[in-house]
């Protein structure tokens, strides 16, 4: 019989949990290509072909984005932290990742690293930055299909956990080392 592992949080983990509870209001930003369709982040799970969906990146141009103004507005609203969706299940990276050209800098005419700008604004205005990163990827052929994302046109025979883990870990390393205190 398999034994159930017992989780024991570290002192640092318990402290982080308490700090989060004490933070009160935070802003969670879910934003990406799916926003252009007036849809939520699960839009691609509705039978949309991933290759067709990816073409929308060529029209993603958030001209009104101003990180300093956003963070200032969050602070005025009483927020103590902001959590930014760096990458959702559609696989589009909202930062200048070196691991894939499917990102805000390389795949859009906008060409700016939104996460860099948000990170800098948060540091200047003493706002804590948290990052959300989806482990699911409905566009990469090496990501094995789970319970969702079956109708995106990916070839499920190309699933390869080792290559996907390598990709994911490289992206997570970028996020946790290149964008200041997280």
Where are these regions (language model features)?
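Mature catalytic domains of secreted/periplasmic carbohydrate-active enzymes
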Residues: 2-182
């Amino acid at each position: 019989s398999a034994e159930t592992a017992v989780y024991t949080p570290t002192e640092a983990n318990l402290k982080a949990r308490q700090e989060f509870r004490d933070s009160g209001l935070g802003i969670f930003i879910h934003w990406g290509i799916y926003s252009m369709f007036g849809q939520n982040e699960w839009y691609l799970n509705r039978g949309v072909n991933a290759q067709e969906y990816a073409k929308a990146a060529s029209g993603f141009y958030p001209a009104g984005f101003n990180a300093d103004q956003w963070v200032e507005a969050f602070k005025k609203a009483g927020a103590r932290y902001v959590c930014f969706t760096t990458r959702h299940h559609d696989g589009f990276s909202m930062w200048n990742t070196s691991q894939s050209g499917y990102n805000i800098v390389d795949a859009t005419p906008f060409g700016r690293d939104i996460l860099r700008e948000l990170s800098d604004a948060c540091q200047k205005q003493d706002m804590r930055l948290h990052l959300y990163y989806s482990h699911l990827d409905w566009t990469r052929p090496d990501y094995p299909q789970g319970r969702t994302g079956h109708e995106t046109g990916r070839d499920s025979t190309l699933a390869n956990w080792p290559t996907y883990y390598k990709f994911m870990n490289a992206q997570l390393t970028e996020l946790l080392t290149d964008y200041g205190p997280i």
